[in-house]
Swiss-Prot record:
Enzyme class: hydrolase
Species classification: Bacteria, Pseudomonadati, Pseudomonadota, Gammaproteobacteria, Alteromonadales
EC number: 3.1.26.4
Name of the gene: rnhB
InterPro entries: RNase_HII (IPR022898), RNase_HII/HIII (IPR001352), RNase_HII/HIII_dom (IPR024567), RNaseH-like_sf (IPR012337), RNaseH_sf (IPR036397)
Domain RNase H type-2: 24-214
The protein's name: Ribonuclease HII
Amino acid sequence: MTKQILPSVIKLITPEQVLLLSEGLVAGVDEVGRGPLIGDVVTAAVILDPNRPIAGLMDSKKLSEKRLQALYLEIMDKALAVSVGRANPSEIDELNILHATMLAMSRAVAGLNIKPERVLVDGNRLPEFALNAEVERHAIIKGDGLVPAISAASIIAKVTRDEEMLQLDARYPEYGFAKHKGYPTKTHFEALAQFGVLPEHRKSFKPVALRLLS
């Protein structure tokens, strides 16, 4: 009989718990891009190799651009498995950003070429994963700064999405995506007012919706 392990949300985690949860084939999962007005929400799932440790893993938001790029390359080289999942603006508009993020996380885990024994997600919610019941799954609040596999996932997701914003900037340089990465800044609002809504904008987000009505 298959043993079912109930999912949980972990609010406080000790260093000892981090070590225990990091044993075996652990997939860390995180997202980048819930707040921007444009583009996909990007998620990543990473299974690290315990025999090839990576120093300096932490929340991607606390890393310099140079360090981000270096860690991205090291993760891609050393990890046992890396998968990126995304939800596009149409899916975000249809589902809302929370459910679209959960969908993207599910896609990231489904894309792993190694089956994890445990899935650890940053935050306080767990997606519906297409996994067997015996696979542990936990949401860890502020996990991107605590659990190495989640930190690695946050780095992969951020570098991936930032690169996509650079590509968008090359197509629409007047919007300034290289600088603000699609977030709701003054520059972005001014570009929306002057140049209008792009196909890649999230039409359900209020600043974009208001511009469509004007």
